[in-house]
Design a protein with these regions (language model features):
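A structural signal for short, hydrophobic/glycine-enriched beta-strand patches
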Residues: 2-165
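Basic, amphipathic N-terminal segments that precede the first structured/catalytic domain
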Residues: 1-2, 174
Length: 174
């Protein structure tokens, strides 16, 4: 089925099964001068899911992979400034690619006592991770972004203090 239909069906299922204890949001490289559209949509999707009772907590996942900023820390700071309470957002800081995002965050969620877990990302990444999730994190449900539901027109993401996300002496993995 198409990515659009896959996202819509997953969202309909999530409506019936909400609330989740936590959602996992994979990181995207943070660029201080220009936030990417992928980062914007993932953060706005997390906010939508939090504001609409789909989840009580959010784990952002990602290390300093392609920029000198730890993706998950930057995303957490941004989401906190958008109104998701800081005590309900977490940063998983080791993951360097998609499968590590889901696996390390799933392990973190379990350590924190969360049992009802979902992955919240774009439909393409969600679909790519589906077989990995089934094999290694079978209790994780997908809630891919439904673009007709997401309202990214709400404005630009806030400017944040990136001091705590910056890695001195950073070396790209490429």
């Amino acid at each position: 089925c198409s990515f659009k239909r896959y996202a819509e069906k997953s969202y309909e299922r999530a409506i019936k099964e909400k609330p989740f204890d936590v959602i996992i949001v994979p990181g995207v490289p943070y660029e201080k001068e220009k936030t990417t559209s992928v980062m914007k949509m993932r953060i706005w999707w997390a906010k939508h899911l939090y504001d609409n009772g789909f989840t009580k907590n959010v784990i952002f996942s990602g290390s300093a992979v392609y920029s000198p900023f730890v993706e998950s820390i930057a995303m957490k700071i941004i989401s906190d400034s958008l109104g998701i309470p800081a005590e309900h957002t977490f940063a998983e800081t080791k993951a360097e690619h998609s499968t590590e995002n889901i696996y390390y965050s799933w392990k973190m969620a379990k350590r924190l006592g969360f049992t009802k877990i979902a992955l919240a990302t774009d439909p393409f990444q969600s679909r790519l991770l589906k077989s990995f999730i089934r094999k290694y994190c079978p209790d994780v449900q997908e809630i891919p972004i439904v673009f007709s539901v997401l309202e990214m027109d709400e404005g630009v993401l806030p400017t944040i203090d990136t001091t705590s996300a910056y890695v001195r002496g950073y070396v790209s993995i490429t």
